[in-house]
């Protein structure tokens, strides 16, 4: 009887140990499988992100190259040389010319040039011709009539006589004694002319007048 009880206890313990071992082995196998799955998922995610980033970089480079080629073609069509077109596309300064109308971008191969520096040209308006009355020549013309000539002469003489009373200068314009030149180290200036007569604030000769 005792042997049977001991045998049952031993069998139960052995079964429990065997079940625990089997469970531990199964859990270890599941953990290893889960680890391999996570590692494969991480590897696939990294490869996917790398491929997508590569495609995005390629698409961005292709779009940039297309835009630069379009700008280059437009500059070439506008008359710029290939060197100036390349500089303009890269953002570098291009060749410029200076004439009486200002600074311009050199475009030697341009098909049309104007005298204006990028300004809008006024639309020419049609001029209505004025009808002129034909005048006869000689003394029969009213412009050469003796009375007209006499009145013109008298009016001119009167205008000249009236101008004689007008002074050619301001009454105090010639009363300046002396003015310190710009290169002088002296700061003294003497003048009997009020500052309101001349606008000397922006004249180089009077630069030291108010020092």
Swiss-Prot record:
Transmembrane segments: none annotated. Its main location: virion. Keywords: Capsid decoration protein, Capsid protein, Host cytoplasm, Virion. It holds the Pfam family RNA_capsid. InterPro entries: VP2. The keyword DNA-binding does not apply. It is found in: Virion; Host cytoplasm. One of its GO terms (cellular component) is host cell cytoplasm. The N-terminus domain points away from the virion surface. Homooligomer. The portal-like structure consists in 12 copies of VP2. Interacts with capsid protein VP1. Minor structural protein that forms a portal-like structure at a unique three-fold axis of symmetry, following binding to the host receptor. The channel formed by VP2 may allow the delivery of the viral genome through the host endosomal membrane. Translated by a ribosomal termination-reinitiation process from the bicistronic mRNA coding for VP1 and VP2. Belongs to the norovirus VP2 family. This is Minor capsid protein VP2.
């Amino acid at each position: 009887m005792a042997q049977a009880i001991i045998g049952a206890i031993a069998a139960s313990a052995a079964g429990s140990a065997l079940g625990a071992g089997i469970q531990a082995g199964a859990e270890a196998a599941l953990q290893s499988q889960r680890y391999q799955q996570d590692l494969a998922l991480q590897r696939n995610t990294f490869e996917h992100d790398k491929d997508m980033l590569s495609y995005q970089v390629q698409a961005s480079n292709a779009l940039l190259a297309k835009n630069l080629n379009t700008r280059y073609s437009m500059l070439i069509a506008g008359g710029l040389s290939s060197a100036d077109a390349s500089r303009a596309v890269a953002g570098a300064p291009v060749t410029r010319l200076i004439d009486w109308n200002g600074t311009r971008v050199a475009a030697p191969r341009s098909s049309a040039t104007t005298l204006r520096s990028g300004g809008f040209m006024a639309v020419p308006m049609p001029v209505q011709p004025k009808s002129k009355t034909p005048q006869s020549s000689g003394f029969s013309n009213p412009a050469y009539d003796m009375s007209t000539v006499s009145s013109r002469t008298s009016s001119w003489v009167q205008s000249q006589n009236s101008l004689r009373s007008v002074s050619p200068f301001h009454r105090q314009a010639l009363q300046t004694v002396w003015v310190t030149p710009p290169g002088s180290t002296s700061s003294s200036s003497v003048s009997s002319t009020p500052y309101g007569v001349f606008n000397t604030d922006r004249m180089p000769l009077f630069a030291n007048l108010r020092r």
